[in-house]
Amino acid sequence: MNTAVFLNIHANTYARFAHIRTQLMQGSKDSQANALGSVLSEMACEVIEQVFIVLLQENQHYSQTGESEKVIQQILEAVRKYMPWSVSFFSNDRLVPLVEYLSKTLQIEDETIYMTYPIDQKLAQRVETSSQKLAAGDQQEISNALRLLTEVIDVGVTHLIREPKKCLKFNFVVDKTLNGVITMTTHLGYKRLEKLGTQLDHQVASTYIDYFLKFMRHQA
């Protein structure tokens, strides 16, 4: 049995991506780089807002400083700045491998579009076990639960950002810049989740873990 994470993508965002893919497959002479960079940044932001929604919830209910919201905004701003910039370098033919890679991560079910990535079955089981412990009132499980979710999220970063980035075969300078941006943004999110492990009670933590479990599906 395989397990995958399914994250919603807005229909209009997907429609833009599909149009760009069609243009590339038909050999359009019009550059698709700027349009693709824009739509990929929107897709990334939609995914980020879903997986880090606990930070926004925490900000609303617990934090008076807006610290979590600032973290989210820093991440989103970096994505919107660097993703279009990174794609803008390339001609249409160089974009095709990236678009084909990402198209394979997308699934449509009942007119709902998902971006998906696989996770190890053992990791999925550990998340489920952690959820059960939280539901039983185990306050000591909070930090471990959020650490496990960080692992699940980072698998997604690998499948949806690190691996497809290789399709573009950046030069050393650009690749190093992008790796730095990826490291910085993920570190911001992960450190904030880690800090929440010392601040949330088990009921709030359990709610978020259960929310994230809804993204995880077991497939034959």
Model-derived regions: residue spans:
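Protein-protein interaction and targeting regions used for scaffolding, dimerization, and localization
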Residues: 1-220
